[in-house]
């Protein structure tokens, strides 16, 4: 068997995993529930639209799975608010991480910034990019 064929066979084997398939199925159903609930329940829309942030992996998943046919009434509002929330949070963590970097610049020697968001900006950025919060 050629190396290319062996690689293809290994890729097919590693494509499926019972646990990964179950997790993926559950997550895709949850995403569908978000769309359906946003479309049908005003309280959920208000709660969703007032969130301070969504992690990048879930933003990506919600945008990639979005289908206008499933969200006829509120689809535009949904994507607009999802983008607004994520963009606002991205701007905030960009500002925080910039301030954090300035703290370690030699020109800022002796200056202190007691802002908790600035001091936690690295952890907050990792959580945003990966969807995982660093261990306490």
Locate each region found by the language model.
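Intrinsically disordered, low-complexity regulatory regions of eukaryotic proteins
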Residues: 1-136
